[in-house]
From Swiss-Prot:
It catalyses: ATP + H2O = ADP + phosphate + H(+). The macro domain mediates non-covalent poly(ADP-ribose)-binding and recruitment to DNA damage sites. Mediates auto-inhibition of ATPase activity by interacting with the N-terminal ATPase module, encompassing the helicase ATP-binding domain and helicase C-terminal domain. Binding to poly-ADP-ribosylated histones upon DNA damage releases the auto-inhibition by the macro domain and trigger ATPase activity. Does not bind monomeric ADP-ribose and mono-ADP-ribose fails to release the auto-inhibition of the ATPase module by the macro domain. Residues 628-654, 687-711 are annotated as: Disordered. Frequently overexpressed in hepatomacellular carcinomas. GO terms for cellular component: nucleoplasm; nucleus; site of DNA damage; site of double-strand break. This is Chromodomain-helicase-DNA-binding protein 1-like. It comes from Homo sapiens. Changing residue 857 to Q: Found in patients with cancer; loss of auto-inhibition, leading to constitutive ATP-dependent chromatin remodeler activity. Belongs to the SNF2/RAD54 helicase family. InterPro entries: ALC1, DNA/RNA_helicase_DEAH_CS, Helicase_ATP-bd, Helicase_C-like, Macro_dom, Macro_dom-like, P-loop_NTPase, SNF2-like_sf.
Amino acid sequence: MERAGATSRGGQAPGFLLRLHTEGRAEAARVQEQDLRQWGLTGIHLRSYQLEGVNWLAQRFHCQNGCILGDEMGLGKTCQTIALFIYLAGRLNDEGPFLILCPLSVLSNWKEEMQRFAPGLSCVTYAGDKEERACLQQDLKQESRFHVLLTTYEICLKDASFLKSFPWSVLVVDEAHRLKNQSSLLHKTLSEFSVVFSLLLTGTPIQNSLQELYSLLSFVEPDLFSKEEVGDFIQRYQDIEKESESASELHKLLQPFLLRRVKAEVATELPKKTEVVIYHGMSALQKKYYKAILMKDLDAFENETAKKVKLQNILSQLRKCVDHPYLFDGVEPEPFEVGDHLTEASGKLHLLDKLLAFLYSGGHRVLLFSQMTQMLDILQDYMDYRGYSYERVDGSVRGEERHLAIKNFGQQPIFVFLLSTRAGGVGMNLTAADTVIFVDSDFNPQNDLQAAARAHRIGQNKSVKVIRLIGRDTVEEIVYRKAASKLQLTNMIIEGGHFTLGAQKPAADADLQLSEILKFGLDKLLASEGSTMDEIDLESILGETKDGQWVSDALPAAEGGSRDQEEGKNHMYLFEGKDYSKEPSKEDRKSFEQLVNLQKTLLEKASQEGRSLRNKGSVLIPGLVEGSTKRKRVLSPEELEDRQKKRQEAAAKRRRLIEEKKRQKEEAEHKKKMAWWESNNYQSFCLPSEESEPEDLENGEESSAELDYQDPDATSLKYVSGDVTHPQAGAEDALIVHCVDDSGHWGRGGLFTALEKRSAEPRKIYELAGKMKDLSLGGVLLFPVDDKESRNKGQDLLALIVAQHRDRSNVLSGIKMAALEEGLKKIFLAAKKKKASVHLPRIGHATKGFNWYGTERLIRKHLAARGIPTYIYYFPRSKSAVLHSQSSSSSSRQLVP
């Protein structure tokens, strides 16, 4: 890497350059895909660029250089990483352990990909609550032979002392822009781990500044890029747009540490992605709010530097206003009922309503992103109102629920997936959608890029349309253009091999710019007080659609709502021949001054009339932002009572509507499920609940059922030694009881294997029930098991109680007592109806901390005490075990020979 004139700028070359020049280079033998298959790679055919990536990673490992795999989102960084593990274990006999840190939202995806691509590598998912993780820690300490440990950033920080105890061969950090701050707790904590090789995965290796880039470099190679030299790095490369020599040097510097490929270069077969911006008008209500927000704090415009926080707050409030005025408290009219007013109050939702109707009729499926979870709430109400099927993921949704939502969207014909850009834009694979809509834009364009990549990625077989909704003549225009300009600069430098952004602008300039941004478009926006929501021809803008696919590659027309062609490659503030880059237009400035003068006049008038000026920002539009300054009339007790009554009636009505909607949704889901079962010729073996049994069974047959068992000995538990899969029964039917989880995956060993030897039905029926979503906690599957062998008299049946939960991370819960009790109630009804005996293993045997005493009481309460002959089996593993079992039994627990 020797470069002519390396020290010409600033004298002595920085330490990181000198150290890099002296680094040795090791060579790794080239890896072929057949080698990886021989070592255990399954379920995937690596593309040529992915195989190149694996070889590059192997080379970095041999050089002992940590590195950054910065491929564009959707190109398969996960499979390349797993292939590296297979290479290390297969060729180098390096069996780890390997540590993977990732966001909670993709934890299950990593687990599934490990099982799919590398089933020969054992993978432990380190997740759960404090108690569950404590149990995992004990297991890992006693049996630490695993290849991969998978966990989240948050759990890593909580249990850092435990995870530090392992000598990690490889540390993988997914979505590694979390490490862009050298001073962050995660950066500092991971720097203390014992790691041979660090690998960072990020589709956005450069987001904002040189400092963030250096933070990633110092993490993967702290010896080369010391934290103290970040200033030297920034100073040396801050003007690379102007200095080609500096850019070339930085390119060479980064080559050993950063590999980035983009879809346009390596995935040419990937269907096309087209981006369209559609502009919308504003409702009269939105315009009123827009004015009021601007006038709420005039002081912020008079001293920009000192009032930066206030200006940012004004910008945030204006963006909320452009989204929907109902985001402000007290605006939505009472009683709170969903109706057309939702779309009439917002120009954005008015356009979205037309857009979704167009997409729904065309058979498209949509990812709908917003910055604000409150906006997602409004969109969710809208989806219910229009009857569109949807899933939702935002920052409040737990990992297990996220995985289920993603799975449902992939497997069922759900129309819309509602996502928050930050929480839903990372790591998810949602290629079932072919349309992405941004309700609002992120300040950081990389976040929107990641979000769009949920649909446009490897595995997508349809063209993808990305649609961005922008409020015309509002702050949204400037936010979007700033982001577009920033992204254009980033792409120019990264894809050119330069990998970085220029220096940050001075803070004062940014503040001045913000104060001007807020005035943009006022002349046109406030030219009238009425609504500017227009009807547009969506097909002419979006292009032709056929059979649920976008088929037109023509550029969208610039009519109606789109301005893409007008903008071209102009400056980000240059529209229609006017340059807004340094200051707003004369017309915008004049409109703002008129608003200010009007506000001051109203304030003076209010002062003269003796009104309180505490809420001076609300004078322009009373009651709109912080409440009215107008003195309220005191209501009489009767009027107060009447108002309270109306509010209670409205609340009760809304609750009824919600309950009715919930009931209808449950009925629709049940009906859909029944139709699905019927189409698959599936018949459920689930027992009904105690409440659903007919009264004649509960009452009329009770005497005859219980008179048969009047002997006191018959109402106590009987303990026997033997194999529960071959019940010691007389001529009556026998119900064999076994507890399973709700995953639908049949277990191995113990009673699972014994039942398979007895009958082929248990595995087949249980796994089919799992596929048909017929397993729920407290449920019981009951079916005969006499297909291989049977008694001369009486029938043997197996009752599988779903008493355990296995989450999406493959973590199995203990036996849930409530589910067990519910299952025992159902078994009682079945045994009573059949006049059968019940035969159970010692449930929870050898499970640490299991409450056998409580379980025994439940069995006695719901079975034996209610007249059902009930047997508990001790399985004799050896003669000594049988003798020990017999000697330790009390008189109340006599073994039945």
